[in-house]
Amino acid sequence: MGKKRFFDDRLKYLSFIQNTGEKKAISEKIYPYISRLSQNKSYLRILDAGTGDGTINANIIKSFHRYHPYTSLLITGKEISYEDLKNTLEKMPDRFVEHPNLLVTMTNVKFSELGLIESASKVNNKKIREFNLILKSDNSYDFNSQITGNKLGDFIKKYWGIEIDNKGRTSYSNPCIVRIYREDNSRHLKQFLLSLIHI
């Protein structure tokens, strides 16, 4: 095993992030950039890597809707941790109500592999595991039931695992991608979905 870092210990890491103003400070640094984006954009892509517990991700969506309520937001989160993935997804139901024109993508691959995850069938000689959750209804209660439901939950439990090599380095057991969007807003996202979904 390599040298142990404080964020390798889950309890120490959670204690740190829950008792500092780091996420609030980072979010507040981002808001001015979002407010100054051109109003003429039809869409915006944002990469949040790693998402951690999803706080900054959720704050970005809130801020984006404040200034660009009708613009398509394609936000990709990169996170290898099973727990952080769940925490991030649990923050999304309200965001889909607030900003319907939203495509949330979550993946666990490395930075160098992000360009492959949407266009290839394999990454690092491993089959890409995909799950597309198309949200039905129009309220956060129903969205929460679907996002935290068994179908997506079973996919995550089965495929979103971690492997550790003999040097203590972590990697995914399967390259995964999860996409979530509202069915009643798919017409606005169609141009992006046609090029992404290949299952």
Question: Where in this protein do the model-derived segments appear?
Answer:
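Class I SAM-dependent methyltransferase Rossmann-like catalytic core
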Residues: 1-41
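Generic structural signal for well-ordered secondary structure
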Residues: 23, 53-54
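Conserved strand-to-helix beginnings and helix N-cap segments that scaffold or border functional pockets
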Residues: 27, 57-58
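Class I S-adenosyl-L-methionine-dependent methyltransferase module
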Residues: 39, 53, 59-195
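Conserved beta-strand elements of the Class I
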Residues: 45-47
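Conserved S-adenosyl-L-methionine
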Residues: 50
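Conserved small/polar residues in nucleotide/adenosyl-binding loops
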Residues: 197-199
